[in-house]
UniProtKB/Swiss-Prot annotation:
Cited SUPFAM superfamilies: Enolase C-terminal domain-like, Enolase N-terminal domain-like
Primary enzyme class: lyase
Lineage: Bacteria, Pseudomonadati, Pseudomonadota, Alphaproteobacteria, Hyphomicrobiales
Binding site for Mg(2+): 242, 285, 312
One CC-aspect GO term: phosphopyruvate hydratase complex
Residue sites binding (2R)-2-phosphoglycerate per the record: 163, 337, 366-367, 388
Location relative to the cell: Cytoplasm; Secreted; Cell surface
Cofactor(s) required, per the database record: Mg(2+)
Residues annotated as catalytic: 205, 337
Protein family according to the UniProt entry: Belongs to the enolase family.
Name of the protein in question: Enolase
């Protein structure tokens, strides 16, 4: 009854106004699943490949009609008649059909759209919410959000070199309370920025993008906002960074163009260690460049016992790169982005590998998002304990928070908010 009978796909717009792929899957019993695919601004060189049309006369070359066509024809021909409940077989069939190591022929955007829509259709056929269908009865941990309230780097037009400054409501008792706490800090920060004469326009992910001179200036504003909102920094609300260091790694050094400084690999490690010592920073993502394995190892050895070090561009949700990191003792956490690897099966495999090795996993959005809230369900399904899905503004970000609120309500007394237990390093402090 769960045989796949039809796939329809279309070109829709993401939160930046760029085209992306949306896929509908229909099963033999009439069950329906729909998924929309996100897109990143700062992308790792080792990510699976989005298929873009390259026709400069449409969407400045960013159209996705080729991926749409692939989903509706070649992929449908390959998986039509297969059981949607056999997710692994469906995903493996698409990967084999593509035949490239990075999904470049059919496009990770086509394959992922179908993969997620198949899972949603199978969940509907089983009468279960997606988080329960994917995670079983064990999926009940609501993640601590990483809320991106100041944007810099590739996500904003300002001098700040780091891409994201985030708050984590580790002291909340529930997901709903965590969202409330984050919202209160967000609005308090807005008032303080405005009072100081800064603009309060928001970046791609809903955070503010003020013209501040340095990371320290941004962190000071965030600390002030946390206190002014009535919370204790480091206790109620911890800090997290996404440096996106690959974006400013040039000629073997880290070029802080906004600050007018260049730091060697060793100086970059020392700088991040200094920030962790000065502020209640419990997580740093991409503190070193994606192929600076030596720098990553230095950073891990220096502060990995007291700070979560998240590999995004480093690992790109890829089990081969993650296995190298585990073997070398590099980083201690992986960012999970479904479109970096391009299928649900491979995404779940990366989470499983990380958790078995004692690494944490952070479920994540992309800067180019849609109203699709699948990652909220996946965060609960995998019990990963952390989610990164933007600020407390823009409906494309709030769709995920709102879905988590619904999931928490649906779980009732079974729901468990991860809190400080989500970060091993925080428990040691």
């Amino acid at each position: 009854m769960t045989a796949i009978t039809n796939i329809s796909a279309r070109e829709i717009l993401d939160s930046r106004g760029n085209p992306t792929v949306e896929v509908d899957v229909i099963l033999e019993d009439g069950s329906f699943g729909r998924a929309a695919v996100p897109s990143g601004a700062s992308t790792g060189a080792h990510e699976a490949v989005e298929l873009r049309d390259g026709d400069k006369n449409r969407f400045l070359g960013k159209g996705v009609l080729k991926a749409v066509e692939a989903a509706q024809t070649e992929i449908l021909d390959a998986i039509g008649g297969m059981e949607a409940e056999d997710q692994v077989a469906v995903d493996e069939a698409m990967i084999e059909l593509d035949g490239t190591p990075n999904k470049a022929r059919l496009g990770a955007n086509a394959i992922l759209g179908v993969s997620l829509a198949v899972a949603k259709a199978a969940a509907e056929a089983s009468g279960l919410p997606l988080y329960r269908y994917v995670g079983g009865v064990q999926g009940r941990v609501l993640p601590v959000p990483m809320m991106n309230i100041i944007n810099g780097g590739a996500h904003a037009d300002n001098p700040i070199d780091f891409q994201e400054f985030m708050i984590m409501p580790v002291g909340a008792d529930s997901l709903a309370e965590a969202v409330r706490m984050g919202s209160e800090v967000f609005h308090t920060l807005k008032g303080k920025l405005k009072k100081a004469g800064h603009n309060t326009n928001v970046g791609d992910e809903g955070g503010f993008a003020p013209n501040l001179p340095s990371a320290e200036a941004a962190l000071d504003f965030v600390m002030d906002a946390i206190s002014a909102a009535g919370f204790k920094p480091g206790q109620d609300m911890a800090l997290a960074l996404d440096c996106a260091a690959t974006e400013f790694f040039k000629d073997g050094a880290y070029a802080y163009e906004g600050e007018g400084k260049t730091r060697t690999i060793e100086a970059q490690v020392d700088y991040l260690a200094q920030l962790v010592a000065t502020y209640p920073i419990v997580s740093i993502e991409d503190g070193m460049s994606e192929d600076d394995w030596a720098g990553w190892k230095l950073l891990t050895d220096k502060i990995g016992d007291r700070c979560q070090l998240v590999g995004d561009d480093l690992f790109v949700t890829n089990v081969e790169r993650l296995s190298r990191g585990i073997a070398e003792g590099t980083a201690n956490s992986i960012l999970i982005k479904v479109n970096q690897i391009g299928s649900l099966t491979e995404t779940l495999a990366a989470v499983d590998m990380a958790q078995r090795a004692g690494y944490t996993a952070v479920m994540s959005h992309r800067s180019g998002e849609t109203e699709d809230s699948t990652i909220a369900d996946l965060a609960v399904a995998t019990n990963c304990g952390q989610i990164k899905t933007g600020s407390l503004a823009r409906s494309d970000r709030l769709a995920k928070y709102n879905q988590l609120i619904r999931i928490e309500e649906g779980l009732g007394p079974q729901a468990l908010y991860a809190g400080p237990s989500a970060l091993k390093q925080l428990a040691r402090r």
